[in-house]
């Protein structure tokens, strides 16, 4: 510790190399991974960058002990960068994506889980004013009912993505949030694992979402999204509630496209900055207006005024597709959880399957 304090003095007068060497030694030889990484300047750049991140984290109030322990041996994870470049939401067609996620087996399991936990789910839904079947739908798709939470180091994954220039600001914020999660003692460092992009727990919350939305529903003093399903479902429910979920409203519906439609003429004049998936939504129209264009619900909707009386945007289909999706306001809330139209449609369809079996 004496060495590191001396190094910080040198940093203030501009001798950056001393700082880098001392911090690297403290973090377990951080710079030594240069020989194991791919050729080029990136390992050295990453090591220097991590020194700056350490400084930022401590300035934000995270203890030096937490930061130093978290950064021991951290180096870029090429698996994370490869996964980032081939996300299924962007490389698969709607049909391929849905076939792999909204399967008969998953729908059956979702209905079983819903029935077994219906009383608890309805208590949670009532408290947060959301619709209970969606809790199971999110749980199913995010972690296969809690069974697949990921085995990537959260810190290493976020450091890798934060160092990458494409979305550096976003992932730097998530890295700081992850360090805060550790610093507050919510999970031990050796258990701090999850998805390749830094999502964690049975509901695959990003660290900032955990800090903002995680719930202690059973009152045991812990916000446990890793092994406590009551906390998992309540955290999802609170997230949806805080992102403008409208209880009792439809997410949308499957539709048949009977004839070609010039969707380019139906696009909004402008799109609110944020989720890029919204760029593929038309402006909202009534079901009557859509029907006049040859787009009709796959299932009759007129009996329910909460559905038939609303306006819906169309997720613009690929050329030649005869099945599409009209989506409402709750669809936007689903997109806030994961900004991908295919993902959001999967959530809606799976929730519909649970509801259909429960009626």
Model region roles, listed by residue range:
Residues 99-112, 165, 169, 186, ...:
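Substrate-binding clefts and substrate-entry loops adjacent to catalytic sites
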Residues 189, 196-304:
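Flexible, glycine-rich surface segments
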Residues 17-30:
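Bacterial N-terminal signal peptides
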Residues 1-15:
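N-terminal secretory signal peptides that target proteins for export/translocation
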Residues 57, 66-76, 129-146, 178-181, ...:
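Short, functionally critical alpha-helical segments immediately adjacent to catalytic or ligand/cofactor-binding
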Residues 37-125:
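An acidic, Gly/Ser/Thr/Pro-rich helix-cap/linker signature
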Residues 261, 267-359:
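C-terminal soluble interaction/assembly domains
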Residues 76-83, 143-153, 164-168, 184-190, ...:
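Secretory-pathway/luminal and periplasmic proteins that interact with or process carbohydrate-rich
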């Amino acid at each position: 510790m004496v060495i590191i304090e001396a190094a910080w003095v040198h940093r203030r007068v501009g001798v950056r190399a001393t700082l880098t060497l001392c911090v690297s030694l403290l973090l377990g030889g951080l710079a030594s991974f240069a020989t194991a990484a791919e050729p080029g300047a990136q390992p050295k750049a990453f090591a220097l960058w991590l020194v700056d991140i350490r400084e930022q984290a401590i300035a934000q109030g995270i203890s030096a002990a937490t930061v130093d322990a978290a950064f021991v041996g951290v180096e870029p994870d090429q698996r994370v960068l490869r996964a980032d470049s081939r996300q299924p939401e962007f490389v698969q067609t709607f049909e391929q994506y849905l076939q792999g996620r909204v399967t008969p087996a998953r729908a059956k399991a979702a209905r079983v889980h819903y029935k077994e936990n219906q009383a608890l789910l309805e208590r949670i839904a009532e408290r947060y004013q959301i619709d209970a079947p969606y809790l199971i739908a999110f749980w199913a798709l995010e972690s296969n009912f809690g069974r697949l939470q990921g085995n990537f180091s959260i810190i290493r994954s976020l450091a890798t993505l934060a160092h990458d220039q494409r979305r550096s600001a976003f992932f730097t914020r998530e890295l700081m949030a992850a360090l805060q999660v550790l610093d507050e003692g919510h999970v031990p460092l050796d258990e701090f694992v999850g998805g390749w992009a830094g999502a964690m727990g049975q509901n695959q919350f990003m660290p900032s979402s955990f800090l903002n939305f995680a719930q202690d529903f059973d009152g045991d003093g812990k916000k446990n999204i890793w092994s406590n399903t009551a906390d998992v479902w309540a955290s999802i429910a609170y997230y949806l509630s805080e992102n403008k979920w409208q209880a009792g409203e439809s997410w949308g519906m499957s539709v048949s496209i009977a004839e070609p439609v010039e969707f380019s003429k139906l696009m909004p004049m402008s799109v609110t900055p944020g989720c890029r998936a919204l760029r593929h939504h038309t402006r909202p129209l009534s079901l009557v207006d859509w029907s006049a264009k040859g787009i009709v619900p796959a299932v009759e909707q007129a009996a329910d005024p909460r559905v038939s009386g609303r306006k819906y945007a169309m997720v613009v289909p690929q050329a030649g597709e005869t099945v599409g999706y009209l989506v409402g306001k709750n669809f936007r809330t689903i997109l806030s959880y994961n900004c991908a139209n295919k993902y959001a449609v999967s959530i809606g369809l799976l929730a519909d399957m649970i509801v259909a079996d429960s009626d």
